[in-house]
Amino acid sequence: MTHEFTESYDVIVIGAGHAGVEASLATSRMGCKTLLATINLDMLAFMPCNPSIGGSAKGIVVREIDALGGEMGKNIDKTYIQMKMLNTGKGPAVRALRAQADKSLYAREMKHTVEKQANLTLRQTMIDDILVEDGRVVGVLTATGQKFAAKAVVVTTGTALRGEIILGELKYSSGPNNSLASVTLADNLKKLGLEIGRFKTGTPPRVKASSINYDQTEIQPGDDKPNHFSFMSKDAEYLKDQIPCWLTYTNQTSHDIINQNLYRAPMFSGIVKGVGPRYCPSIEDKIVRFADKERHQLFLEPEGRDTEEVYVQGLSTSLPEDVQKDLIHSIKGLEKAEMMRTGYAIEYDIVLPHQLRATLETKLISGLFTAGQTNGTSGYEEAAGQGLIAGINAALKVQGKPELILKRSDAYIGVMIDDLVTKGTLEPYRLLTSRAEYRLILRHDNADMRLTEIGRDIGLVDDERWKAFEIKKNQFDNELKRLNSIKLKPVKATNDRVQELGFKPLTDAMTAKEFMRRPEIDYATAVSFVGPAAEDLDAKIIELLETEIKYEGYIRKALDQVAKMKRMEEKRIPANIDWDAIDSIATEARQKFKKINPETIGQASRISGVNPADISILMIYLEGNGKAHRKY
């Protein structure tokens, strides 16, 4: 079929949420002429649910996005109202930043960034179809009948894909926050042959700040020392005038109201068909599943400086409006609270992610990429991370350059994508630190050390960032080398000082680095014995030094495991392999291999239901069969 195109682009991104913004900024910054198409320009980078960025695992993803040259970290650093480091009482592997956002300012600031980006056209339009010829993307069709040519298309439609809002007995077609749903595109994605799933998520009511009795709640302030998501943000820019959040709880009266109205709850009446998020359940689901709990935490989170709206985190619900009001008024501090928005549930279509490659390109259609909630994830951060990788790979494909695949040992983003494409997901996927087997080397403090060079190689890290990174890396390397070369000897003067500090005396000579491995010895104490570095070191470099030195043994073990897995990841599996021709593989493994069509032995080994014997048989088969090949 010959198409008459009115406009032509290298890449078209459909949807301007957190995934779409990162995808389009990446492609345009890499030199591709890009169109970012969205149903509503006023909702670009909008936060339809929680007014926050980061959190456990998610905060590390934002740092990874920043290290690669993405935008989310820089944007939240400009627009937050509170910043907090989580899990400070635990090990470095699970520490992560979380920021309360001024949600309207966050969206406005991101829109400004997109509007001034070279090579990037922003258009309010609805895309109804993906145009495909001979198994390859050639463009898109708008609802008004316009055809735009493209060499690659990235679908980042979020919860708008055949979205339906559910509130009590009411159910109607809608995207998030009463925006338009994308119904025709959902139909046409299915017609293209993609397998489609149906998920559900929800959001809590918002209450008016001036109607809250804060005396009945517990204040939750931000940190009083500088912290940032972006490695380029300066401590001098740290916000001192932060806005606190507040903690309250449900109670028995709250639970009674919910239990008495379960017959009206869409979650239990059969109205909701989609699968909801395990790690962010509705309040009615929590009351039923955890009936023994006397109360549940609720955090009152301001949505910005210039609004009275307060987000009631932990109270996600689709109960009828009258029940939501009674529920709110049963809660301490909210007895007279004015509900400004009701909570609701939203159901939406997803593209089942086992159909994707680790580049986030669909296996079925060349040049078609998907990212974000379209792939079955939950959360702004997960969406942004996928959007960045999908955008990078769309640009690399257009330019005929080698693709970028982040491994599980490279980044939490790599863990997430590998989980999605290898295991699929039966519910909205959320990143957790427990999902990462190499979490000690995937830390908040070393994201730039892991990923900045990759960002530079693909063209997303500019000269200013690269110079700052080189300075930091050189300072780190030089100081680590110095600490490993200077020795402390067990002489009387040294041991007298050690004992004065309340520490065990030295029995043998040791390097300053070995001295720092002692749990009680921090960097400041060590340099008080051996003298300071040649130049003043930033606090973040000192933090990195302490972690790398104190956990060196564990880090080395993790890196050994990475090296072993790398050998498996390098063993490619041909795309045209005949799984039925491999004798002795278990039936379940054969079925999973056919469904997922893994690209490497490493990926095959992580598929649920596949055991080591199946992998051994597969490796023997591949060694004796060199005719097959993988081509995309």
Curated annotation (Swiss-Prot):
Its cofactor is FAD. Pfam families: GIDA (PF01134), GIDA_C_1st (PF21680), SAM_GIDA_C (PF13932). Keywords: Cytoplasm, FAD, Flavoprotein, NAD, tRNA processing. It is found in: Cytoplasm. NAD(+) binds at residues 276-290. PROSITE patterns: GIDA_1, GIDA_2. Coiled coil: none annotated. Homodimer. Heterotetramer of two MnmE and two MnmG subunits. NCBIfam families: mnmG_gidA. This is tRNA uridine 5-carboxymethylaminomethyl modification enzyme MnmG. The gene is mnmG.
